[in-house]
UniProtKB/Swiss-Prot annotation:
Domain of life: Bacteria
Cross-link (Isoglutamyl lysine isopeptide (Lys-Gln) (interchain with Q-Cter in protein Pup)): 591
Function, in words: ATPase which is responsible for recognizing, binding, unfolding and translocation of pupylated proteins into the bacterial 20S proteasome core particle. May be essential for opening the gate of the 20S proteasome via an interaction with its C-terminus, thereby allowing substrate entry and access to the site of proteolysis. Thus, the C-termini of the proteasomal ATPase may function like a 'key in a lock' to induce gate opening and therefore regulate proteolysis.
Binding site for ATP: 296-301
Family assignment from sequence similarity: Belongs to the AAA ATPase family.
Pathway this chain belongs to: Protein degradation; proteasomal Pup-dependent pathway
pH dependence: Optimum pH is 7.4-7.5.
Gene Ontology molecular function, alphabetical: ATP binding; ATP hydrolysis activity; ATP-dependent peptidase activity; identical protein binding; ubiquitin-like protein reader activity
Protein's name in the database: Proteasome-associated ATPase
PROSITE patterns: AAA
Record note on what altering residue 187 to A does: Impairs Mpa hexamerization
Quaternary structure and interacting proteins, as annotated: Homohexamer. Assembles into a hexameric ring structure that caps the 20S proteasome core. Strongly interacts with the prokaryotic ubiquitin-like protein Pup through a hydrophobic interface; the interacting region of Mpa lies in its N-terminal coiled-coil domain. There is one Pup binding site per Mpa hexamer ring; the K(D) measured is about 3.8 uM. Upon ATP-binding, the C-terminus of Mpa interacts with the alpha-rings of the proteasome core, possibly by binding to the intersubunit pockets.
Entry GO terms, CC: peptidoglycan-based cell wall; plasma membrane; proteasome-activating nucleotidase complex
Primary gene name: mpa
């Protein structure tokens, strides 16, 4: 057996590295083992020397121990080598020069790119690992010490906010207005170009999934040094106040206000639909309409119906499809327009009218509707805790009849305290037309009930049987009975006894405080009672008794409404004008068993918050 074979027989790897001391000792052991093996081979019979066999086992054990030590040493050396490599990589990384960043301006066919970096426009090469064709304009790129593009980043997410004035003809540039009304032309980054390409350009034809187009007045994130706009920033404070839509409300949905509807159609629709006739007669269309009257009588509903009707009529004049009629109804939530910071309310008003002019420039009618107009345009000088109206009112006046003017824009205001609105707003030439939306009388109430009680409603079999199954006659009788009950001057319908400043007294009935909203509430309450009746008895259908019970419940709930510190203010809000009221006594005798209550007011109370 050779030396290498004997080494492998003892479990020592042929190529295992050993220290000098271990190698010498191992070589001595090998020689001793060779001598002992020769002695064993020369021995004859069964009396082989046991000492030699024992020595061999000891030598083998020692060889195994040395092999284990050698294996452990190899693992230690391997770990040390890996740590050295990691440290070398860290040293190399820390020793690298800093990288720069820039904004990509353009790409070229020879794999070079134009980059704006460190205030300079430079043409640079791309690393072989970068596909220059995949880079997008306006994208952030990383540069090494040799000014080579080595990595593509995202689009810039911080910068200045500028307002879009207009998109230039090529669709890739825009005119924006920055701080201090400074105008500049900037490039549009690729995400904005996808939104904003004009429909006539070839790049826009196949883009069916692009977001909505940019429009003048949008806020853009701009890098003024690189000359790029990256993103459209929503204007939350204005978007929350402005609702752009064509309301799905028509004049047919409004009951009991035919005279007022005719007035507002004459004021709004005629100037838009017959501009030539107005020019021929040198007649100036009204700039605004004021709808005033008690709460719940349909002021907001009429304003929505005006926008809907005007859009359809304009579509007919242009020969467009009525289903694709387009108009804009900017619904301004009056109290939310107020802002505690100086100048913010005025700025919001400017933005609203700027948006209206932008829409109207397309030739589309725009209605700016101010609900609760008295809350933001109070008479100047009447403020107690603030004087915001001294600047807000002039801002509205300048927008209505300023130098720029309003073309295709009409302002509609709604209020139940028209006496609190500044007189300068109500003068002719501003809100020219003033339409009072009165409380419904018995005839108007029948019209309103007919909008809610239709022949499609399920009617109880017993009520139908009284009219030989004629559903139309049954519904008509229901409406007549419920209107008679609501407008009857009986003791159960007495509501208030008011005392005027001159000592006169007057008994007022619930019919004096009816409104379209109350009628809708009565019908809804009756329908709910009909549903409960189905669940309890299993007999479906609406009954006249459900409506009569609902009237009693509705009147009883209104018992606490006049409980106010100042009866005269409450009466004005409710639509009661004339002599000042100093004393109110409730006369409700419905389901409530409590005694009637009186509300008095003292004179010279002064102003209160």
């Amino acid at each position: 057996m050779g030396e290498s074979e004997r080494s492998e027989a003892f479990g020592i790897p042929r190529d295992s590295p050993l220290s000098s001391g271990d190698a010498a000792e191992l070589e001595q052991l090998r020689r001793e083992a060779a001598v002992l093996r020769e002695q064993l081979e020369n021995a004859v019979g069964s009396h082989a020397p046991t000492r030699s066999a024992r020595d061999i086992h000891q030598l083998e054990a020692r060889i195994d121990s040395l092999a284990a030590r050698n294996s452990k040493l190899m693992e230690t050396l391997k770990e040390a080598r890996q740590q050295l490599l990691a440290l070398r990589e860290e040293v190399d990384r820390l020793g690298q020069p800093p990288s720069g960043y820039g904004v990509l301006l353009a790409t070229h066919d020879d794999d070079t790119v134009d980059v704006f970096t460190s205030g300079r426009k430079m043409r640079l090469t791309c690393s072989p690992n970068i596909d220059a064709a995949s880079l997008k304009k306006g994208q952030t790129v990383r540069l090494n010490e040799a000014l080579t593009v080595v990595e593509a980043g995202t689009f810039e997410a911080v910068g200045e906010i500028s307002t879009l004035r207009e998109i230039l003809a090529d669709g890739h540039r825009a005119l924006v207005v920055g701080h201090a009304d400074e105008e500049r032309v900037v490039w549009l980054a690729d995400p904005l170009i996808a939104e904003d390409l004009p429909d006539g350009l070839p790049e826009a034809l196949n883009d069916d999934t692009r977001p909505r187009k940019l429009r003048p007045g949008d806020s853009l994130l701009v890098d003024t040094k690189a000359g790029y706009a990256f993103e459209r920033i929503p204007k939350a404070e204005v978007e929350d106040l402005v609702l752009e839509e064509v309301p799905d409300v028509s004049y047919a949905d409004i009951g009991g206000l035919s005279r007022q509807i005719e007035q507002i159609r004459d004021a709004v629709e005629l100037p838009f639909l017959h501009k030539e006739l107005y020019r021929e007669y040198s007649l100036r269309p009204p700039k605004g309409v004021l709808l005033y009257g008690p709460p719940g009588c349909g002021k907001t509903l009429i304003a929505k119906a005006v926008a809907n009707s005007l859009a359809k009529k304009m579509a007919e004049v242009r020969g467009d499809d009525a289903h694709e009629a387009k108009s804009y109804f900017l619904n301004i939530k009056g109290p939310e327009l107020l802002n505690k910071f100086v100048g913010e309310t005025e700025r919001h008003i400017r933005l609203i009218f700027q948006r209206a002019r932008e829409k109207a420039s397309e030739g589309t009618p725009v209605i700016v509707f101010f609900d609760e107009m008295d809350s933001i345009f109070r008479t100047r000088g009447t403020g107690v805790s603030s004087d915001v109206e001294t600047t807000v009112v002039p801002q509205l006046l300048s927008e209505i009849d300023g130098v720029e003017g309003l073309e295709n824009v009409i302002v509609i205001g709604a209020s139940n305290r028209e006496d609190m609105i500044d007189p300068a707003i109500l003068r002719p030439g501003r809100l020219d037309v003033k339409i009072k939306i009165e409380r419904p009388d018995a005839e108007a109430a029948q019209d309103i009930y007919s909008k809610y009680l239709t022949e499609f409603l399920p009617v109880h079999a017993d009520d139908l049987a009284e009219f030989d199954g004629d559903r139309s006659a049954c519904i008509k009788a229901m409406i007549e009975k419920v209107v008679d009950r609501m407008y009857a001057e009986i003791d159960d319908n007495r509501f208030l006894e008011v005392t005027y400043a001159n000592g006169d007294k007057e008994v007022m009935y619930f019919k004096d405080f009816n409104s379209g909203a109350m009628i809708q509430n009565v019908v809804d309450r009756a329908k709910k009672n009909a549903i409960k009746s189905v669940l309890e008895t299993g007999q479906p259908g609406l009954r006249i008794q459900h409506l009569l019970d609902s009237i009693v419940d509705e009147f009883a709930e209104n018992e606490d409404l006049p409980n106010t510190t100042n009866p005269d203010d409450w009466a004005r809000i409710s639509g009661k004008k004339g002599e000042r009221i100093v004393y109110i006594r409730t006369l409700v005798t419905g389901k409530s068993s409590s005694a009637s209550r009186a509300i008095d007011t003292e004179s010279n109370l002064g102003q209160y918050l």
